Amino acid sequence: MLASASLLAFASSRPSRAAGEPLPAPPVTPKIPVTITQLGRARVDDYAWLHQPNWFTSLTNPSSLNPAIRRHLDEENAYCDAVLAPTASLQAELAREIAARSTDAGGDPPSPDGPWLYWSEVRPGANHPTFLRRPRNGGPDQVLADFDVLAKGRGYYRISNIREPMHSPDHSLFAWAVDETGDEHFRLYVKDLTTGVTAPAIERCFGDFAISPDSQWVFWVYRNDQSRPTKVFRRSVRGGPDVLVYEEKDPAYFLTVRRAASNGCLFVTAFNADCSETRIVSAADPTATPRLAEPRTPGLLYDLEHWGDHFVVRTNAGGAVDFKLMTAPLDDASRQAWRDWKPAATGRFIAEVRAFQSHVARLEWIDAKPMLIVSGRDGADRTVTVDEPAYALELDPEAEYASNEVRYSYQSPRTPKHWVAYSCPTGVERVLQSQTVNNFDRDRYEVLRLDAPSADGVLVPLTLLRRRGMAQPGPAILFGYGAYGDSLLDDFSPANLSLADRGFVVAKAHTRGGGERGRSWFEASLKLKKKATIADFIACAEHLVRQRLAAPGKIVAHSFSAGGILIGGALNARPELWAGAVAEAPFVDVLNTLHDATNPLVFSSFPIWGDPARPEVFDYIASYSPYENVHAAPYPAVLASAGLLDDRLGYWEAAKWVARLREKTTSGRPILLHTDMAGGHQGADSRAEVIARTARYQAFAIRAVSGIWDGAVVKA
């Protein structure tokens, strides 16, 4: 069975404690009061000492971590392991189920490009993918990179998740970026496929890169000492010195680089949530100074796609909140040259555009559902429809520009992933490949899409997966995020089936702050409106109870990163509503983090959360920040995770929050912290580790809804 040895080793390595034994005593977090005065407002932080002042040093040199902090984190890990020890067999069982259902790891179907077919697959027993190709007209497979082999002997290994072809346009090179330490400082490698020689690694890459259209240069984004993407360099694919292409001096902006699908140019883009600016690198002369398209203007967002003799511009210009499409000539991509092509339509959010030789494909979100729309050069639109109440659609990022087909994937919470080719001339679709899932019968499950009324009357989309015939109301797990305009995809998860088979309703709350209902849905939770996200999440939980889909007090909340605001706020506002909460690398110490100029995300975050240097923003953040608002209440069981090398949301966020929750809770339910002492924000992505981590969270959720932690039901 896939990765079974690793998974069983994970379970058996945990400390043993029989079910029914008393809970061990939690670590005592010393209270060292620190008074923080800002804008004439004073507050006391008893756990500020957990935030090491020179924390960036510990990212590159973990041994420099204050011994008292390390000792505390080790004690928290030991306590977490001891409390969860009675679930070891359950974790192993869940891990086996997830692995068994996930044995079809063939990856995406081969993508044609010129004379080759490219694809990746996770081979039986492997933890990382292998990238391959073979001649389009037939011939043997060629291994481009076997990441399971490359990861051998490394404690941490994560491949950069870029939506770019990793091979060069002339098919002579293959490039990849990997984080080998957990601090998200990627190394970029370029391999000559003719000789098999890999050039010396490019250090301190942010993860984004693109090979130039002439296949002579690799363009990459540099990560500085503060972990910010500040420069774009180019280097010969054969090695040599780095040449500065562009430097971004405003810390409020991120940088990215990508090659046009047509190979007609490269785009270097500086952006944040409020503004963007793109420079064009000519395919004819990749060493020339990039040409600015349209200078940055506050509130103006745009991006470009190269399409034949002009650019397609996706933009919010002219009040197009949900974006529109315009065109611009190749020799003048400034705003004054933009011309309307596809006008804005209220409630139709244009999320993504991809140009092909004879057509343009775009993804639009309409009423919290993605739609695929294809336009020819005559401007006529064709819409690909899906007959399910909730689902996910994604465009193939490596689709061939010269093709007359649009390749996309489709899935839903009860429908495994299907890869489909849509013929632009005929409108006929053909299924390229379907994900095979063992021990799974689609008809045993159903998907529902509901609308939960929030406190202000706004209807919040709510997606549910449940197994047919299960008694209700029962337990539920509610996922949420609600930040940065990112949409929670209604995708297929083999892991969620294990919960559904145990009577759980698996739900996703599409709260404001996400992008499911367009840019306006995102903007409805910005700055002085952030509490809408928390209210929406609570409303979704209440709706589950009201519709008798979940039992009162039997709901587990689950989120990640910026979703910590959503979970922490919901626990503070309605602690009795929840049986438990899983908070992965949570953003919960909002006020302190936004005042920390050493955090690489702070300045770019002001368009999202607001600038706390302004009194009204400070006071508003202080009124919802989870850490600041923990109070004496019957909190549910909590499992928080952190990464010691996380440079986005430091380990201390979760550690301080857990300490304050444990100090204030009146319920007796365990408040747990697990810190990956060798990991960062994302965690390791080996197959065995991902499955084991998921099994731990699920076992915690099952235990939480049982209400039994020490052999007796814990009363609120």
Residue ranges and their predicted role:
Residues 2-5, 10, 19-405, 411-417, ...:
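Beta-propeller folds
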Residues 334, 396, 402-403, 411, ...:
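Extracellular/periplasmic ectodomains of large secreted or surface enzymes and adhesion receptors
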Residues 263, 275, 299-301, 308, ...:
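Active-site lining segments that contact anionic ligands and/or coordinate catalytic metals
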Residues 149-165, 178, 182, 424-426, ...:
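Cap/lid segment of the alpha/beta-hydrolase catalytic domain
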Residues 316-318, 352-358, 362-366, 454, ...:
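C-terminal substrate/ligand-recognition segments
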Residues 122, 316, 411, 479-483, ...:
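Glycine-rich His-Gly loop
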Residues 509-716:
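Active-site-proximal cap/loop segments of hydrolase catalytic domains
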